Curated annotation (Swiss-Prot):
Protein keywords: Secreted
Tissue: Expressed by the skin glands.
UniProt-annotated location(s): Secreted
Species in which this protein is naturally found: Limnodynastes salmini (Salmon-striped frog)
Name of the protein described by the UniProt record: Dynastin-6
Domain of life of the native organism: Eukaryota
Cellular compartments per GO CC: extracellular region
Length: 10
């Protein structure tokens, strides 16, 4: 999902 994508970028 969108949130998971942002977290993996960190």
């Amino acid at each position: 999902g969108a949130v998971s994508g942002l977290l993996t970028n960190l």
